[in-house]
């Protein structure tokens, strides 16, 4: 049985050995909840990896956004190169859920763009969980969404062995049942092709390896791993297993039972609509559901089959769906990174999903069973009972309460770096003073983060700094994950010097080149200027030996005072450690190359900085620029749940695609 094998040039130092020992002992003792209070730059990820290596248990690391998840994935991949480190986040680049707007009688079909690379990584994650123990998965809150039954997923895998008696056509039928498509021309993930007595399968969880099954009559003569592009044999296997191409698979008896239950619910729903004189809704639900039933009967699946997952899984109404947690064994370990943010996100997912689907059910677009295709509620998440370690520089009250107030502290940085000194300055001339400090920092070839209170102020400040010749970018919530990663990398590379944001410059941004963090209007008490937010924001300058923080404020608030006191406490402890061990602080050295860089390069689209006015288009490039602008608006509308507007923008984008093609043909 494979074991976690931690590989690193470093040994635990500072507070790390004590933290590793206390957390590991707590897990072995059976403690359900523990808190690791680790300051920025103290090596929390390294501590987590050491705990995993000590307890040797399948592990889920939960992050609150894709950017942080990608960063953690890269770090764990380097620490455990011989183990199954996987990445499980939403595979949608763009996702517009189906929705109905009663006020305008507008139904918006589900529309999405799937990132094939991330889809492959999701399949790789579930496959690893069901085939080995040395698995560490880094996930976003996608892990609490319905995924399909692990029993069905594992039960329908196809086991193949050299010398095995198997009819070739039976194998082809089995592949179709687990949702592989036959394609003899375009061989890609999730397809198979047939050439005489040879069947080649491209597993959904692979990228550079496919399988070649050679038959001699009704016997498997050989199994090979091949290069899918060149057809070259990479390895010869005695046995292998092919996992399904979808997480929503079911045997024929299960499908037949599900169809009967769907028909029963449909009859009940039709009776209810007719009794309430809702004839249009009755016709609508009957037409849509009967079409889905026919597709399931003939093909084994339909578009939106996840809405019938309750019947496929054999669940009762209201029972929680199967999620990634159900693919883990009982002795799994859970780390919740930046827990003060991530925990609150978990509860919010269910409420937003429920509201949209209730409208669809009420107006006959979906049956009530669709409500059970949902994320876990917070109570269901808690009921999983997995041993959990909450990791944060600023643990919230919930985590502290769960751990009975016991906290494992990690405030000493092995690098010797101190928490940045904080300078409080008057808010009256904050912009002029900020410009002066930015120019001083740029002269040192270092970067600046600026955090504002409002989106409008961030936009105006970005524009003003740009007019002064300062290379500046604005990071906001409408920017998708891949582009956000690209922006952060460009900041590190020095393509621009100043990054302005609101609430996105706090948790998890690991940028050693940043030596100045400026907090405007620091005395405006609220969520963005709470004690935890201020400590987190200040921490962004803690990876540079010259790191410093400027708070612009006309008074010292309670949150500011708490932040100043905690920072001073940590500086004092770090100074004492440095003197005792003769450590000279040095800026963190971190490679620019990201483990997910290839994905970013494939999917990154540079959006135009200035939106062009609608008008006549003279070149394909003009149309491309307009398509990019419309796409940005569409993504923003979808993120704000403005489904009707997003659908209109999507249609506009499709029209522009046709226009670009016609212009190219004319040219």
Swiss-Prot record:
Q: Where is the Helicase ATP-binding domain?
A: 25-414
Q: Which Gene3D superfamilies match?
A: 6.10.140.240, P-loop containing nucleotide triphosphate hydrolases (3.40.50.300), UVR domain (4.10.860.10)
Q: Which locations, inside or outside the cell, does it occupy?
A: Cytoplasm
The residues that cross the membrane are: none
Q: This protein's superkingdom?
A: Bacteria
Where it mainly occurs, coarsely classed, is: cytoplasm
> Which stretches make up the UVR domain?
624-659
The UniProt keyword set, sorted, is: ATP-binding, Cytoplasm, DNA damage, DNA excision, DNA repair, Excision nuclease, Nucleotide-binding, SOS response
Motif Beta-hairpin, residue range(s) on this chain: 91-114
The residues covered by the Helicase C-terminal domain are 430-596
InterPro entries, A to Z: Helicase/UvrB_N (IPR006935), Helicase_ATP-bd (IPR014001), Helicase_C-like (IPR001650), P-loop_NTPase (IPR027417), UVR_dom (IPR001943), UVR_dom_sf (IPR036876), UvrB (IPR004807), UvrB_inter (IPR041471)
CC per GO annotation: cytoplasm; excinuclease repair complex
Function recorded in the entry: The UvrABC repair system catalyzes the recognition and processing of DNA lesions. A damage recognition complex composed of 2 UvrA and 2 UvrB subunits scans DNA for abnormalities. Upon binding of the UvrA(2)B(2) complex to a putative damaged site, the DNA wraps around one UvrB monomer. DNA wrap is dependent on ATP binding by UvrB and probably causes local melting of the DNA helix, facilitating insertion of UvrB beta-hairpin between the DNA strands. Then UvrB probes one DNA strand for the presence of a lesion.
Q: Which NCBIfam families match?
A: PRK05298.1, uvrb
* Family in the record: Belongs to the UvrB family.
Subunit organization: Forms a heterotetramer with UvrA during the search for lesions. Interacts with UvrC in an incision complex.
> Could you identify this protein by its name?
UvrABC system protein B
The species this protein was found in:
Syntrophotalea carbinolica (strain DSM 2380 / NBRC 103641 / GraBd1) (Pelobacter carbinolicus)
């Amino acid at each position: 049985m494979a074991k976690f094998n931690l590989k690193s040039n470093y040994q635990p130092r500072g507070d790390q050995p004590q933290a590793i020992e206390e957390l590991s002992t707590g897990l072995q003792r059976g403690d359900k909840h523990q808190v690791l209070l680790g300051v920025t730059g103290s090596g929390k990820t390294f501590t987590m990896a050491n705990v995993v290596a000590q307890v040797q248990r399948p592990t889920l690391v939960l992050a609150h956004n894709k950017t942080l998840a990608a960063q953690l994935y890269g770090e764990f991949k380097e620490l455990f190169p011989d183990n199954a480190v996987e990445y499980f986040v939403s595979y949608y680049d763009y996702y517009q859920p189906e929705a109905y707007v009663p006020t305008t009688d507008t139904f918006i079909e589900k529309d999405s763009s799937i990132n094939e690379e991330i889809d492959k990584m999701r399949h790789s994650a579930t496959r690893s969980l069901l085939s080995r123990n040395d698995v560490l998965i880094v996930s976003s809150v996608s892990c609490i969404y319905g995924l399909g039954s692990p029993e069905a997923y594992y039960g329908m895998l196809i086991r193949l062995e050299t010398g095995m008696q198997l009819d070739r056509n039976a194998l082809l039928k089995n592949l179709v049942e687990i949702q592989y498509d036959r394609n003899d021309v375009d061989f890609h993930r999730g397809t198979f092709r047939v050439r005489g007595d040879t069947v080649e399968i491209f597993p959904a969880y692979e990228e550079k390896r496919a399988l070649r099954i050679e038959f001699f009559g009704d016997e498997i003569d050989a199994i090979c791993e091949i290069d899918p592009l060149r057809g070259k044999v990479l390895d010869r296997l005695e046995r292998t297993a092919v996992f399904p191409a979808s997480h929503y698979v079911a045997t024929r008896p299960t499908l037949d039972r599900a169809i009967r239950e769907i028909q029963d619910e449909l009859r009940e729903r039709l009776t209810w609509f007719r009794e309430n004189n809702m004839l249009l809704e009755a016709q609508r639900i009957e037409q849509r559901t009967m079409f889905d039933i026919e597709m399931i009967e003939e093909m084994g699946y339909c578009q939106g089959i996840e809405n019938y997952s309750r019947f496929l899984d054999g669940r009762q109404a209201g029972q929680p769906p199967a999620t990634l947690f159900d693919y883990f064994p009982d002795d799994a370990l859970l780390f919740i990174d930046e827990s003060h943010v991530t925990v609150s996100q978990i509860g919010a997912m269910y409420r937003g999903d429920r509201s949209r689907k209730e409208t669809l059910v009420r107006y006959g677009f979906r049956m009530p069973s669709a409500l059970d295709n949902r994320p876990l509620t917070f109570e269901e998440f808690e009921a999983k009972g997995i041993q959990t370690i909450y990791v944060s520089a600023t643990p919230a009250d919930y985590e502290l309460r769960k751990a009975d107030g016991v906290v494992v502290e990690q405030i000493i940085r092995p690098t010797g770096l101190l928490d940045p000194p904080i300078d409080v300055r008057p808010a009256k001339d904050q912009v002029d003073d900020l410009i002066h400090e930015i120019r001083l920092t740029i002269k040192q070839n270092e970067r600046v983060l600026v955090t504002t209170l409002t989106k409008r102020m961030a936009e105006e400040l970005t524009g003003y700094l740009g007019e002064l010749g300062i290379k500046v970018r604005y990071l906001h919530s409408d920017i998708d994950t891949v582009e956000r990663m690209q922006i952060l990398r460009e900041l590190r590379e020095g393509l621009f010097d100043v990054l302005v944001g609101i609430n996105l410059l706090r948790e998890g941004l690991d940028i050693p080149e940043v030596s100045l963090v400026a907090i405007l209007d620091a005395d405006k008490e609220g969520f963005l200027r709470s004690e935890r937010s201020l400590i987190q924001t200040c921490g962004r300058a803690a990876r540079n030996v010259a790191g410093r923080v400027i708070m612009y404020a006309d008074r010292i608030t309670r949150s500011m005072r708490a932040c100043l006191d905690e920072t001073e406490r940590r500086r004092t402890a770090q100074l004492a450690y440095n003197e005792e061990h003769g450590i000279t602080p040095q800026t963190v050295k971190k490679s620019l190359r990201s483990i997910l860089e290839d994905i970013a390069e494939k999917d990154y689209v540079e959006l135009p900085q200035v939106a062009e006015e609608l008008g006549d288009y003279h070149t394909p490039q003009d149309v491309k620029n307009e398509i990019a602008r419309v796409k940005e608006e569409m993504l923003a509308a979808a993120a704000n749940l403005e489904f009707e507007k997003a659908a209109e923008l999507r249609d506009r984008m499709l029209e522009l695609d046709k226009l670009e093609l016609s212009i190219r043909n004319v040219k």
